[in-house]
Amino acid sequence: MDKTQSSQGKCPVMHGANSAVASNNMDWWPKALNLDILHQHDKKTDPMDPKFNYREAFNSLDLAAVKRDLNALMTDSQDWWPADWGHYGGLMIRMAWHSAGTYRVADGRGGAGTGNQRFAPLNSWPDNANLDKARRLLWPIKKKYGNKLSWADLMILAGNVAYESMGLKTYGFAGGREDIWHPEKDIYWGSEKQWLAPTENPNSRYSGERDLENPLAAVMMGLIYVNPEGVDGKPDPLRTAQDVRVTFARMAMNDEETVALTAGGHTVGKCHGNGKAQDLGPEPEGEELEAQGLGWLNKKGPGTGANAVTSGLEGAWTTHPTQWDNGYFHLLLNYDWELKKSPAGASQWEPINIKEEDKVVSVGDPNRKFNPIMTDADMAMKMDPEYRKISEKFYQDPAYFSEVFARAWFKLTHRDLGPKSRYLGPEVPNEDLLWQDPIPSVDYRLDASEIVDLKAKLLASGLSVSELVATAWDSARTFRGSDFRGGANGARIRLAPQKDWQANEPERLQKVLKVLTELQASLSKKVSIADLIVLGGAAAIEKAAHEAGVKVTVPFIPGRGDATQEMTDVESFAVLEPLHDAYRNWQKKDYVVQPEEMMLDRTQLMGLTAHEMTVLVGGMRVLGTNYGGTRHGVFTDKVGVLTNDFFVNLTDMAYNWKPAGSNLYQIVERKTGAVKWTASRVDLVFGSNSILRAYAEMYAQDDAKEKFVHDFVAAWTKVMNADRFDLA
């Protein structure tokens, strides 16, 4: 053996590639377009059988039996993590709350719909400390019911049962959340490089007076909502009230729902800070192998029960923290409060001259009592004038408070599950709620011959290929796979606010809708405008493909309903407004983010892959669907014909590409210097990015003409049917 070698054996393989030690492509070229978000949940990571259907599995579940087991778990205290006052309800509610509470309306990402709390970064966020214990307590139930019950559904159901076990009549529960199998890559949690970074820190999520960066809702990296100690850890209830209002609004909650959720969430359970935070070990992702996925383990003792440390605040909000009552408002409104420090050194509010009967029995010793506590956010419910009015109303009418909370809790835990048609189980409420974006069911069928006849009428209506395709696209492109909102079903493109969105070219849109409405009225059979819009796009694509020499039938399944204005919450739908659309080569204005990055974000929300994005952009260009009829990226002399010309000319070395302005390029003939075409960044990225160029070259090949058409049709159909949950 070489004497210079260490006595420790060398690694038998080329190490580094499977760890964080190795540099990846984005480290070397940080400005490169990262396509990973389009391929994050493919079948390679999913261990389920190809034929596994979670909806069918859940529908075979004995939900009542699961709830009985959960009820039993609530009071079955385990020595390794004892229940506060013998009841796990507060812990389970916090777990469910923090699972759902990451949702934000701006992009629909986050939320409870995927079970993402099991993975980094959420499993190791400071605000999720000790929720790893809640999930381990649930493991015997998950193990028992197996694939019939996802982690995502179980976590929310556990929160629901916890409330019911403590006396709240909940509004209902729906299953249907399918688990993911590895961390999500598409969610932007902020650009800070440290947990709980204060406002003035580099890469702050705030600008101006206190403008929170879109699409974020939480005030700090690693928090679900607001800082419980106050803005940047400095107690000031009125400043905190501003943060609370912004955060909850970005979760689709109004002031009344905000007060109800704050009070209802703090009616039960407690904060944990009876110890020193520095005694805790790393979070789960930073722990050693022997910790087996647990984190925040106390290095100087058990650190459980009465001695647990989580947020650092210490105490319960109410006198009876294992029962649903109106005690939160009784204490908040009837006592004056003063700032104190918890044993862990956190700022919290405690009552002055509290009556003995209003104190809280100690978790560790039933013969001792302690003051209840309030966070800075709780004090905001008293100090902010609007929140105070609502708090007073809830205090005077406990039944009303319970009803508002139950509905708000249902909304919180189901907001990202999508429309009611996706709900599963026997406890789905009968009521249609406006935030569920209801759509009327249809009562007609169309056979193949009727569909052919309708296509002919649409093509003879006087509308062009580009008008039909663009309108169908605009109707469907609002779909978000994050929270299953938007899409062509409902034809809300006819209604406010969508009919007036700049992205939808209102003048052109009204022309098309007028023709379609007149056609609908002339039919002897009822057909929805939603179906006619989609069918018009299909007919136009078939015509364009035929003119390119390819015979193809675009799949079409009728069954879309037409929503009414009364079914449409204008404010709620405003967040779906497109501010950019690479597929139609448009953006409302220049943004800090590059157009191609915005294209990836929109593509991911629509559930498309990189090659589907590629073929759709190439097809939309030659079909002449650019916003306002611009010619950028229309690399063809046969506009309206579904050829692969976009890719043929993009990859042709007879041309040179030159910048000609902001997001504008000229395609110049190398020999003559003549300008042949113009293009935007989202056109040229398909020739610049090495991965996208590989797809572009494949579609530019001489043998790809038919494949291009068929791939375009497949991707198009995927977009048109993205919100057809009835077809699943």
UniProtKB/Swiss-Prot annotation:
Pfam short name (any one): peroxidase
Descriptive protein name: Catalase-peroxidase 1
Cross-link named Tryptophyl-tyrosyl-methioninium (Tyr-Met) (with W-97), sites: 225-251
NCBIfam families assigned to the protein according to its UniProt record, in alphabetical order: cat_per_HPI (TIGR00198), PRK15061.1 (NF011635)
Comment on bound cofactor: Binds 1 heme b (iron(II)-protoporphyrin IX) group per dimer.
InterPro entries in the cross-refs: Catalase_peroxidase, Haem_peroxidase, Haem_peroxidase_sf, Peroxidases_AS
Species, as recorded: Shewanella sp. (strain MR-7)
Keywords, alphabetical: Heme, Hydrogen peroxide, Iron, Metal-binding, Oxidoreductase, Peroxidase, Signal
Record function comment: Bifunctional enzyme with both catalase and broad-spectrum peroxidase activity.
